[in-house]
Amino acid sequence: MRKIIVTESISLDGVMQAPGRPDEDIRDGFSRGGWAVPYTDQVMGSAMGEGMAATGALLLGRRTWADFAGYWPRQTDNPFTPVLDALPKYVASTTLEGPLPWVNSYPLTGDPIAAVRELKAQEGADISVLGSGALVRSLRRHGLVDGYVLLVHPLVLGGGRRLFEPGDEPGELRLTSSVTTTTGVVIARYEPA
């Protein structure tokens, strides 16, 4: 059985919205996009590379998939582009229909939670969820998240969409490992307690 691992860049106040670019996600007037970029270093790059090497597929929400599909195929000089292109990318959406334009992208049809359970039951390497906040919360509600890799950045954004929101089901996590980058980002790995 495969595990579902959620990997997220978050601020100290739990914001996960638009870590990579100013135009990545401007919903609700969010104007602080790209906040994680100044904290990137070799330690983070190595950790992310190791995580991607252990990944057998990506599971993305519609909005994150659309953002990635519009960005990554054009990043021809980025070493992560061929890795992302090669991975199967499953998209949880009730509005997207196949075939999807980004190579190896597949919409999950029918009930997304049932489809994710089927993916999880297959043999193979772990499934990584990147971004996709609403999907992460839904997976968590259904007991489908097996672990988190949280890149906790040393800044407070004061607003924006959060990984965990008020009203989310309480739950305990167990820290399995952590490393601190040269820029003060704590990369913490957790699994449900």
Each model region followed by its residue ranges:
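Periplasmic plug
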Residues: 147
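Portal/gating segments that form or line small-molecule/metal binding sites
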Residues: 1-144, 154-193
